[in-house]
Amino acid sequence: MGSPAAGWGAAPAKRARREGSAESSCGSPADRDPRLWDTERLCQHLSRNGVGEPGLLRRFRESGVTGAMLLDLPACALRITHACLPDERLKVLACLNQLRQTADIMKVFNDPVHGHIEIHPLLVRIIDTPQFQRLRYIKQLGGTYFVFPGASHNRFEHSLGVGYLAGCLVRELKERQPELDITQRDILCVEIAGLCHDLGHGPFSHMFDGRFIPLARQGLNWKHETASVEMFEHLITSNKLEEIMESYGLILEEDIAFIKEQIGGPIDETACEESWPYRGRPKEKSFLYEIVANKKNGIDVDKWDYFARDCHHLGIQNNFDYRRLIKFTRVCEAGNQKHICARDKEVGNLYDMFHTRNCLHRRAYQHKVGNIIEIMITEAFQKADCFFQIEGSKGKLYHISTAMEDMEAYTKLTDNIYLEILHSSRPELSEAREILHKIERRELYKFLGETQPEKVNEIPKDEYDGLAGDIANSKPEKDPPDVELTAEDFIVDVVNMDYGMKDQNPIDNVLFYCKADPSKAIKISKEQVSRLLPGTFSEQVIRVYCKRQDPIIVSAAKQYFVQWCIKRDFTKPQDGDVVAPHLTPLKQSWNNRSKTEYTTASEPSCKQKLSFNK
């Protein structure tokens, strides 16, 4: 899975600077590799792992043991035997042996986004399982790959990146604030949660849980995070990893609960009403739950990796610097809990983060062509669903829409099902196969246009299903086209875009600290940052497509769409004046601009005549 970590003979590097350091976000090589530690650094490690009695540490210093000596544990043990008291030796040797195991077989992966990253051997054991390797066959961005040819990356490499960044952040906090009592167990559990947080994704990632399951299993409240927790349990038990986890110092019941809670939230939903709903870690370590999946404000290492990775593969500029933010984070207490806070001067960087998220959704994730391809794949999967059988545990058979009920069956469900349908010769799959052939030939459903409702007119989710029929009933009365269309001819895709917290400003939920008093958590209002920041943080875009290919029918469908926009008091489609010039004058609000607003720039006084108001 990678090459062994750097050689034992490397010279010790300078200790990483703290806040504002230009070093790697995970510290210098000397910080990361115990084999490069001096005696004092080993003493710090012993102290942070419960072996910190002053007399013991004094005697350990006298032994002169360094990290390089961990390779020869018998010789190391001999020095400790001479220096330490009998009841101290076992505790010291157990702690150092665990450290030696970690240092001995750390693996290095060459990641295109983060560079050379070190992965703990327990994480490597998790990676080398069928359940994790499955992520190699699930596209990170689903149907977006059909539009952006560089977006061929998968959930596998994203998961490696999240596990790595989770370790970077928690180690930085441990180094900066020893009083937090972050242990090696905590670090390992956070890394595992980051690594395994996406185990439950289905074919084409969010297309499966966002489009297919809501249609195939209507009324089922299912999330991929739920499947991630179940798949993690299945991974551990089916590969018999309990013993190896214990050998690295994990306490199974407590730590597995902690890992699952980081991925999917509190295990017991009824416990959410309690003051502290989590079981894996006490309230004193509440900040650990904000690293992998931050439910409070959405700032977490999952986003940091997919921003960087998706931008890299899409060819889109990433303006958010997660490395800098890691250097300016610390834990402060607020509301009787400890939270991860950012330095006050980083508020602009965080707005850049959410702006990057919005740009990615606009330009890539919600691309009109990528979305209609996912809709067509979803249709194909629906038509193939009842004819596909996937064997699960005890020989029981499942369909595409039910495979997530059994993790053995779900392990076999990947993007490959697209090719199985495409290349099948089974007559019962002919309808599904034909839809996929249309995608391959680029015979996509025709885009008619998009419109935006005002905030007060936004369409609620329970009305989505009736929109196609509403458009079909909107045949223009003035010069109507000689074509009758039905609801089956239209596809309506309602896209809700925001900064991650619907219509709220996510920065309102972020805590900061200032240089003058780094222990105090504060909030920063939008007005304190800039007057150029957005006034609203969400909007709804309605896109309409026609399933028919005939140009005459498509032209008529566009007129239906324009008439529907007039009826619903939505914004004018961008090409509304072209596709329905006889309809757009009927809408007063679409034609309230004076002629002077269209004066060309070559005419006199154009600067005074131009208006930029909507």
UniProtKB/Swiss-Prot annotation:
Record-stated family: Belongs to the SAMHD1 family.
Organism encoding this protein: Gallus gallus (Chicken)
Activity regulation as described: Allosterically activated and regulated via the combined actions of GTP and dNTPs (dATP, dGTP, dTTP and dCTP): Allosteric site 1 binds GTP, while allosteric site 2 binds dNTP. Allosteric activation promotes the formation of highly active homotetramers.
SAM domain span: 37-102
Annotated dTTP binding sites: Q140, R155, H201, H206, K303, Y306, D310, Q366
Co-factor: note: Binds 1 zinc ion per subunit.
Any Pfam family the entry gives: HD
Residues annotated as catalytic: H224
Protein name: Deoxynucleoside triphosphate triphosphohydrolase SAMHD1
Subunit and partners: Homodimer; in absence of GTP and dNTP. Homotetramer; in GTP- and dNTP-bound form. Interacts with rbbp8/CtIP.
SMART domains xrefs: HDc (SM00471)
BP GO annotations: dATP catabolic process; defense response to virus; deoxyribonucleotide catabolic process; dGTP catabolic process; DNA damage response; DNA strand resection involved in replication fork processing; double-strand break repair via homologous recombination; innate immune response
Keywords for the protein's UniProt record, in alphabetical order: Allosteric enzyme, Antiviral defense, Chromosome, DNA damage, DNA repair, DNA replication, GTP-binding, Hydrolase, Immunity, Innate immunity, Manganese, Metal-binding, Nucleotide-binding, Nucleus, Zinc
EC annotation from Swiss-Prot or TrEMBL: 3.1.5.-
Function: Protein that acts both as a host restriction factor involved in defense response to virus and as a regulator of DNA end resection at stalled replication forks. Has deoxynucleoside triphosphate (dNTPase) activity, which is required to restrict infection by viruses: dNTPase activity reduces cellular dNTP levels to levels too low for retroviral reverse transcription to occur, blocking early-stage virus replication in dendritic and other myeloid cells.
Coiled-coil intervals: none
Residues involved in dGTP 2 binding: N110, V147, R324, R343, K345, N349, H367, K368, K515
Class of the enzyme per the UniProt entry, highest EC level: hydrolase
Positions annotated to bind dCTP: Q140, R155, H201, H206, K303, Y306, D310, R357, Q366
